């Protein structure tokens, strides 16, 4: 497959949107309304005086440290050149490399989009159900303060909260996610749920968050999980950046509407810049979600995206189907919904899961 460079992505007009979208530096506020400057150029900057042992529980004292600083300039989505970036890759199966941890190779995938309501959580939840039914040991981390994935997967809650992953790993690992005695290689689905304290992660420096979260991902790998799926908030914050730095793959569901499409260049640039520090990160691509086949605007936008980003569009789409919403509300995958209308949705979601499973080269 080809390579899409950051500079190339920026030169392309955004189909259905403002050609200038994403061309300027963007300001992002955290949940407390604090302002951080996000820029595309440069490397990740170390924040002077950071305490690597701090967790989000003590994050309030760190607000002044991060306010007004250019946190991790290498992951900013804004105006900047592409010199030195390795680009966003859509490699062929078999070309990726994952980190071996003990005897277990855990694959980590992040669903990310800087626009909400595009089917990101729905995609992640159905991947979790599909992989679980394949007999895999699946960890799901909900880093979205909205907690929608946590709601759907509440029957699989471990009692471990996502905010804890921005703190030190206990000496013996997290007992909440450890396999029960005798489970061994048995399939399991373990939810690390969102909680209100998670918002404090945005107060950490990115260097702290990256190290702490990365160490916790390695701890999960040591507990025998085959795959870790991470849902993220629809904003470019510390939580999303830390997840991308720890991930092997990233998938971006998109809605075929102008506002959603406008964020594509920013997401592509963010991923390209993260790859400067996390070379193993692979962009699986964009998957059109909530597609209305009867809407000519959706058809036009999809054709424009395919023309603009032919190597970055996943050959699978998920339609706008009420049965998917029914499934999410019921805490089950759409193929468990006993409605005729759910059959087509099930086929689409399963096709997407097959594609992602193949690209991730997950061993069974």
Swiss-Prot record:
Region feature (Disordered): 1-63, 75-102
Pfam families, per the entry: AAA_31
CDD domains reported for this sequence: ParAB_family
Keywords, ordered alphabetically: DNA replication, Plasmid
Biased composition (Basic and acidic residues): 1-10, 26-42, 89-100
Role, per record: This is one of the proteins encoded by the trfB operon; it is involved in plasmid maintenance and replication.
Similarity remark: Belongs to the ParA family.
Protein's name according to its UniProt entry: Protein IncC
Gene transcribed to yield this protein: incC
């Amino acid at each position: 497959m080809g390579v899409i460079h950051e500079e190339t992505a920026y030169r392309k007009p955004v189909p259905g949107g403002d050609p200038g979208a994403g061309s300027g530096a963007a300001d992002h506020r955290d949940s407390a309304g604090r302002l951080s400057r996000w820029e595309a150029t440069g490397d990740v900057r170390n924040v002077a005086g950071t305490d690597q042992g701090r967790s989000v529980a003590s994050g309030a004292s760190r607000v002044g440290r991060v306010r007004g600083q250019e946190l991790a300039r290498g992951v900013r989505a804004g105006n900047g050149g592409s010199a030195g970036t390795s680009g966003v890759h859509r490699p062929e199966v078999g070309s990726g490399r994952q980190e071996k941890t003990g005897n277990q190779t855990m694959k980590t995938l992040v669903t990310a989009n800087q626009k909400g309501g595009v089917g990101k959580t729905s995609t992640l939840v159905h991947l979790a159900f599909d992989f679980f039914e394949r007999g895999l040991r699946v960890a799901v981390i909900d880093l979205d303060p909205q907690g929608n994935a946590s709601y759907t997967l509440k029957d699989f809650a471990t009692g471990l909260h996502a905010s804890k992953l921005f703190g030190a790993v206990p000496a013996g690992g997290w007992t909440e996610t450890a396999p029960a005695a005798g489970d061994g290689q048995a399939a399991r689905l373990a939810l690390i749920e969102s909680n209100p304290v998670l918002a404090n992660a945005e107060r950490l420096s990115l260097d702290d968050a990256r190290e702490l979260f990365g160490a916790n991902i390695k701890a999960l790998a040591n507990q025998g999980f085959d795959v870790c799926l991470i849902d993220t908030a629809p904003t470019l914050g510390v939580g999303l950046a830390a997840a991308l730095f720890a991930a092997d793959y990233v998938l971006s569901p998109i809605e075929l509407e102008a506002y959603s499409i406008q964020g594509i260049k920013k997401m592509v640039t963010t991923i390209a810049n993260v790859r400067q520090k996390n070379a193993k990160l692979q962009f699986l691509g964009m998957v059109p979600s909530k597609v209305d086949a009867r809407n000519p605007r959706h058809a036009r936008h999809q054709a424009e995206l395919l023309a603009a980003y032919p190597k970055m569009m996943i050959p699978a789409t998920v339609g706008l189907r009420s049965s998917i919403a029914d499934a999410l509300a019921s805490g089950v995958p759409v193929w468990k919904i006993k409605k005729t209308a759910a059959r087509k949705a099930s086929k689409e979601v399963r096709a997407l899961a097959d594609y992602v499973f193949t690209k991730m080269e997950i061993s069974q």
